[in-house]
Amino acid sequence: MSLDVRVIAPNKVIWAKNAEEVILPSQSGMLGILTSHAPLYTALNTGVMKIRNETGWTSIVVMGGFVEVEKNEVLVLVNAGEYVDEIDLSAAKKDVEKALETFNSAEAPKEKEEAAEFLKYAQARLKAVVDK
């Protein structure tokens, strides 16, 4: 038996395949999902999720969101996401620099909050590429 896993961002379906295991960056730490997991609804942090299927592990950087687990179906809704293997190291470094500049120049609380989220995502992307 396997999990039916879907990872969906507003602009694309990132993953829609079966898997044996999913590891997610939840608000309370890393969360592992295996078949027959109890029903679950929880918020996700920005970070790297991992999916294991018959070909091995796949890593996806996600920018927050939510996960719903029920009856071996895992629905992950994220604000943004991309495969770690598709991230260019030099571009990721530049994105961190740009996000840091945006954060430092933001003045209004809402701007600062949004800039902080993008900085966190940029840093997660860079860390994921460096760690792979």
UniProtKB/Swiss-Prot annotation:
Pfam families (UniProt xref): ATP-synt_DE_N (PF02823)
The membrane-topology field of this record reads: Peripheral membrane protein
Q: Name one GO cellular component term.
A: cyanelle thylakoid membrane
Q: Which GO terms describe its molecular function?
A: proton-transporting ATP synthase activity, rotational mechanism
**Keywords, alphabetical:** ATP synthesis, CF(1), Cyanelle, Hydrogen ion transport, Ion transport, Membrane, Plastid, Thylakoid, Transport
The entry's localization annotation reads:
Plastid, Cyanelle thylakoid membrane
The record describes the protein's role as: Produces ATP from ADP in the presence of a proton gradient across the membrane.
HAMAP family with a match to the protein in the record: ATP_synth_epsil_bac
Describe the subunit structure: F-type ATPases have 2 components, CF(1) - the catalytic core - and CF(0) - the membrane proton channel. CF(1) has five subunits: alpha(3), beta(3), gamma(1), delta(1), epsilon(1). CF(0) has three main subunits: a, b and c.
* Family according to the record: Belongs to the ATPase epsilon chain family.
Q: What is this protein's name?
A: ATP synthase epsilon chain, cyanelle
Q: Which organism is it from?
A: Cyanophora paradoxa
